[in-house]
Amino acid sequence: MLSTENGEIHAIPITAPLRVGDRRILFRLKRCRESLARLREHPKVALTIFAKGNLAFTARGPARVVQEPMLGAPMFAAIAIDVENIDDHRQRDLVVDSGVSLDWNNERTQRFVQEHLNALREVAASGE
């Protein structure tokens, strides 16, 4: 879940963000969405992850557009978060055993997610 702030907090779901090194996370937003305009105006963001394997953290830092349009997905803009702070939400007595449950079982959706990640990997490899 990505949160941005411009007088009020806006939270939007992010599909399959990609970690690039210790302090950078890539994701993409549709170019026609208001969330992209909000991010340009107010780049300070927080990305919260709760996922299988006891992943529970919030990565905070400025976000910026690194490729628009994306070469592998022209309807999208690639966004990088330059992580400045990480809040660890794990607790000794509680374990996160699953995150948001999505049905990735149909072939079309699996192909979409794979294409999504491949497009982000291309951005990461380009050094943008």
Feature locations, PLM:
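A positional/architectural concept
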Residues: 9-15
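A short mixed-secondary-structure module that forms the rim of ligand-binding clefts
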Residues: 15-54
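Broad gene-expression machinery/nucleic-acid interaction feature
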Residues: 24, 44-46, 58-60, 76-80
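"Short basic amphipathic alpha-helical interaction patches in structured regions
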Residues: 41-43, 61-62, 95-97
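Short beta-strand and beta-hairpin "edge-sheet" elements
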Residues: 58-70, 84
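C-terminal edge-of-domain segments
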Residues: 71-128
